């Protein structure tokens, strides 16, 4: 009876690890996603976006 219990536990562990490994393969769907437009307002918006990210030397000008 003890060997049967160990066999069932080993089978359960193997199945659970298989499910975990196969479950991770479904996650990276974001790589194929269309990149979003970070600068919808064109070149001027891109410039202002860069200034906002790295800090603007003059706050009233940066908005």
UniProtKB/Swiss-Prot annotation:
Keywords linked to the UniProt accession: Amidation, D-amino acid, Disulfide bond, Hydroxylation, Ion channel impairing toxin, Neurotoxin, Secreted, Signal, Toxin
Range of residues in the leader sequence: 1-23
Modified residues (4-hydroxyproline): 57
Maturation propeptide residues: 24-54
Disulphide connectivity of cysteines: 56-62
Subcellular localization(s) per the UniProt record: Secreted
Segments of this protein annotated with the region Disordered: 23-44
Positions carrying D-tryptophan: 58
Tissue spec: Expressed by the venom duct.
Major location category of this protein: secreted
Positions where Cysteine amide occurs in the chain: 62
Start-end of Basic and acidic residues biased regions: 28-39
Pfam family, one: Conotoxin
A GO term from the CC aspect: extracellular region
InterPro entries in UniProt: Conotoxin (IPR004214), Contryphan_CS (IPR011062)
Keyword Transmembrane in annotation: no
Family classification: Belongs to the O2 superfamily. Contryphan family.
Additional facts recorded: Exists in two forms, due to cis-trans isomerization at 56-Cys-hydroxyPro-57. The cis conformation is the major form.
Comment block on domains: The cysteine framework is C-C.
Identification of the protein by name: Contryphan-Sm
Taxonomic lineage: Eukaryota, Metazoa, Spiralia, Lophotrochozoa, Mollusca
């Amino acid at each position: 009876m003890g060997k049967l219990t160990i066999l069932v536990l080993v089978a359960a562990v193997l199945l659970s690890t298989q499910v975990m490994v196969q479950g991770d393969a479904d996650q990276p769907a974001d790589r194929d996603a269309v990149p979003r437009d970070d600068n919808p307002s064109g070149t001027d918006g891109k410039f202002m976006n860069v200034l906002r990210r790295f800090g603007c030397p003059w706050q009233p000008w940066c908005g």
